[in-house]
Regions:
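Residues that define the transmembrane beta-barrel architecture of outer-membrane proteins
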Residues: 25, 51, 57-63, 107-111, ...
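Transmembrane beta-strand segments of Gram-negative outer membrane beta-barrel proteins
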Residues: 22-37
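Cleavable N-terminal export/targeting peptides
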Residues: 1-26
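Transmembrane beta-barrel domains of outer membrane proteins
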Residues: 32, 66-70, 116-118, 158-160, ...
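Outer-membrane beta-barrel translocator domains and adjoining extracellular loop/strand segments
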Residues: 39-51, 90-104, 136-149, 181-192
Length: 215
């Protein structure tokens, strides 16, 4: 899916630029790709009650698609309401000599709803502030309890530039702070004890480019 979205964006980018048309407004479909950096600050509480602290990070390129409604940009201030989906999954795996303590955690199917307030420099160029709510599914395997879904909030700054009469290009840079997640052992024989606990605070920084199509 990610490769398909990137290919579509690349193809559209090299289409001949059309003359600017009327101010964009109404329903739209959007395809985007983002460079993402994930940081997790956390701690590990072992069987002896000792607590270890640490930070891990990872980068990735993701694809997304969304649907939204944009009010007319003919006025100085306009608004954009939307919903976006980031398909795919990412796995974190921990193994040891004792296979009974092996654990895999998978985060998948990220979603976001958002509200955007735009300051319109012209009918074809806008800058904006975005606020959004984010959710993702978490699946675990191994002798550990599922910490539940992942939820958070996003703040971002961006630009929207009209491209022809019914398309636009969006650029955006933002940060998503997820709620703290915590998982404990199930305590099965030979597995992970119930007094073992892992806690993490995930944060995502990203830069995004997207192309939108007005219906």
């Amino acid at each position: 899916m990610k490769k398909l979205l990137v290919s579509i964006l690349a193809s559209l980018f090299f289409v001949s630029y059309a003359n600017a048309g009327p101010s964009l407004s109404g329903l739209y479909l959007e395809l985007g790709t983002a460079a993402v950096g994930v940081e997790m600050d956390g701690n590990f509480n072992d069987d002896d009650g000792d607590i270890s602290y640490g930070t891990v990070g990872k980068t990735a390129v993701t694809g997304s698609y969304g649907l939204g409604f944009m009010t007319s940009r003919e006025k100085p201030i306009s608004f954009d309401l939307g919903y976006a989906v980031t398909p795919g999954s990412a796995k974190i795996k921990a193994t040891s000599d004792n296979t009974a303590t092996d654990v895999t955690m998978e985060v998948s199917d990220g979603t976001e709803w958002y509200v955007v307030a735009m300051a319109n420099i012209t009918e074809d160029a806008s800058v904006y502030f975005k606020y959004g709510g984010n959710d993702a599914d978490i699946t675990v395997t191994g002798d550990i309890n599922n910490p539940g879904g992942l939820s958070g909030t996003t703040v971002a700054l961006g630009t929207v530039m009209s491209w022809g009469s019914n398309m636009y290009i969006r650029t955006e840079a933002g940060k998503t702070d997820y709620d703290q997640i915590s998982a404990t052992g199930k305590g099965t024989a030979g597995g992970i004890g119930t007094d073992v606990k892992v806690t993490a605070d995930p944060t995502v920084h990203y830069g995004k480019i997207a192309i939108g199509f007005k219906f």
